[in-house]
Amino acid sequence: MTRLVLASASAGRLKVLRQAGVDPLVVVSGVDEDAVIAALGPDASPSAVVCALATAKADRVAGALQAGVAADCVVVGCDSMLFIDGGLCGKPGSADAALRQWRRIGGRSGGLYTGHCLLRLRDGDITHREVESACTTVHFASPVEADLRAYVAGGEPLAVAGGFTLDGLGGWFVDGIDGDPSNVIGVSLPLLRTLLTRVGLSVSALWAAD
């Protein structure tokens, strides 16, 4: 039975997949994201950046799987970033950075890009590789200073792309989106369904594999 392997430590991605009927095997890649981005150069498009990161994660995990899993599985690597003002915003990493980022994006709109890399493995070999990104436009509110500081102090925005969540406390400060909500959380179900179809798998086969 085909197993889905999620090459990500993201709680949001895991939640999306579980709510959609798939309980993946989670394997964290440990990829040096800064090194991958640096190798691309300053002119790389948002799609190229998130796809390169997703691919690096999927490749790293695929090469480390136990034989029993690698015999029949799909490895899914994802990476998300917010594109606004001609630049990419990743995970703030600190409270000060999160505050600066929110003061930049508050009251504005940006594109949340998520790169997806799907690897089909049979008998330990990669038989198919599909790489694509999805973008959802996010319209941000302008939180009052007290709310913004409380949000940042709680720690939620520090380790998520763009410094916000759609399905957590950050949802209070998103006025709306244009596009796929699951993409904002970190894995686009419509795109993942398309990629699975390209490698000959249906989503219902994964429902039975959890």
From Swiss-Prot:
It is an enzyme of class 3 (hydrolase). The active site is at D79 (proton acceptor). It catalyses: a ribonucleoside 5'-triphosphate + H2O = a ribonucleoside 5'-phosphate + diphosphate + H(+); a 2'-deoxyribonucleoside 5'-triphosphate + H2O = a 2'-deoxyribonucleoside 5'-phosphate + diphosphate + H(+). InterPro entries: ITPase-like_fam, Maf-like. Its main location: cytoplasm. It is found in: Cytoplasm. One of its GO terms (cellular component) is cytoplasm. Nucleoside triphosphate pyrophosphatase. May have a dual role in cell division arrest and in preventing the incorporation of modified nucleotides into cellular nucleic acids. This is Nucleoside triphosphate pyrophosphatase. It comes from Mycolicibacterium paratuberculosis (strain ATCC BAA-968 / K-10).
